[in-house]
Amino acid sequence: VEGLGWAGINEVPLVVTLYQRGGPSTGLPTRSEQGDLFLVLNAGHGEFPRIVLASGDLEEAFYDAAIAFNYAERYQTVVVHILDKSLSSKTESLPPFDLEQIRIERGEIASPNGHGEPEGPYPRFALTESGITPRPLHGMPGGMHWLTGGEHTQYGRVTEDPVVREQQMEKRMRKLETAAREIPVDEKLRVYGDPAAEFTILSWGSNKGAIVESIERLAEEGLAARLIQVRLMSPFPVPELQ
């Protein structure tokens, strides 16, 4: 997990796909289990922002892969796309995917010499209200900065100054607040069945298929129920669920 922390402190867009199977250790290598959620939420040394997106079926997994990369670049952070093993090793016939739904979002990109120091280093980690600093492209004039595994100034220079440390930590963590505000509700959770039903099942991952089928069978018997499928595990959609 050292690589996750390195990407986190350097605000490097990174997407990791994790297929869950039974543990611990070798555990149940050919069986599906939802036992890695705490791992992806907490893996790494110290704290850094991460977004965790969970797909419920193969169609979602296709579109979510593109969404995960957009999150990573938009918020310049680690994104974990988490799937149950039952989905990762599953074969299923599906209608052709709608490629028109796929959008590529590169996030905030710095303009050449846009920071007023054409010959100097670029403040890659300048403090911003959103926590996101425009990133320079490779070779961009005036875009030089430093990337290390240590805490750093706005230019990337290693420092152990407690004031700078606090500022940079808070800057990075503000990204989760920004993401929570900007990510559409449909990407955070989805509701299946009768929206007004008093009986609610709260679930995530590959349980979706069996639950949706069960709700349909209950409806045939005159029993109203609904599934709330949580898709965004971090930042967790508390206001939307309330």
Q: Whereabouts are the PLM-identified features?
A:
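Thiamine diphosphate
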Residues: 1-42, 51-72, 220
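Structural motif
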Residues: 12-17, 38, 48-52, 77-81, ...
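Generic structural motif recognizing short loop/turn segments at the entrances and edges of beta-strands
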Residues: 33-36, 49, 143, 185-187
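Short, flexible turn/loop "capping" segments at secondary-structure junctions
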Residues: 43-46, 193-194
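A short small-residue
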Residues: 46-49, 151-153
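Flexible, low-complexity linker and terminal segments
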Residues: 64-242
